[in-house]
Design a protein with these regions (language model features):
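NTP/phosphate- and nucleic-acid-binding module
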Residues: 1-172
């Protein structure tokens, strides 16, 4: 839901949720060689998306080396498709770092790690927004929404009054 709220906020109305899976023939080469973990974690993501009623596509050979992921694919203003947001299931790194927890049966287990980037990286998001809005950003997104420029010294007191009212109204 957080993804949908962000997309609505930024006016992104066309996107595709993608279950990015491994390519079985590349286990041990491009992907961590854990076939059972791949099967389980890809199934977990599929179940979550299905139960949430989220339409999605599945693409093989798009996973991270350490696990499957949900990528949110969007098209830029010039029609280029790219991943804006992602949630990645990492079953490899916790084991490599020796991370464990104690389960309800008092047994040590290796956790799954989730990597989340609901709005991508800062750089990718800013690049997308510049292209998406063609530089014509909505007022709420501008770091400076209003600039008061008194044209004579006698207008300064009134400009200060306006400034106070605008700040009180939440304008920047």
């Amino acid at each position: 839901d957080i993804y949908r709220r962000y997309f609505e906020l930024f006016g992104i109305d066309e996107y595709v949720m993608r279950l990015s899976k491994h390519a079985p023939e590349d286990l041990g080469k491009k992907y961590v060689n854990e076939p059972e973990l791949w099967r389980r974690t890809e199934g977990m993501i599929r179940d979550v998306l299905t139960k949430a009623g989220v339409p999605f596509v599945e693409e093989e050979d798009e996973a991270a080396f350490y696990g499957p992921k949900i990528d949110v694919q969007i098209k830029s203003a010039i029609g280029r498709e790219f991943s804006l947001a992602t949630i990645q299931v990492d079953f490899a790194q916790p084991a490599r770092f020796g991370l464990t927890y104690v389960d309800e049966h008092n047994e040590r287990r290796t956790p799954l790690c989730l990597h989340r980037a609901p709005l991508s990286t800062h750089e990718r998001l800013i690049g997308f927004l510049i292209e998406h809005f063609a530089g014509d950003f909505p007022v709420w997104l501008a770091p400076e929404q209003v600039r008061l420029v008194p044209i004579a010294d006698r207008h300064v007191p009134y400009a200060r009054q306006l400034q106070e009212r605008m700040l009180a109204a939440g304008l920047r």
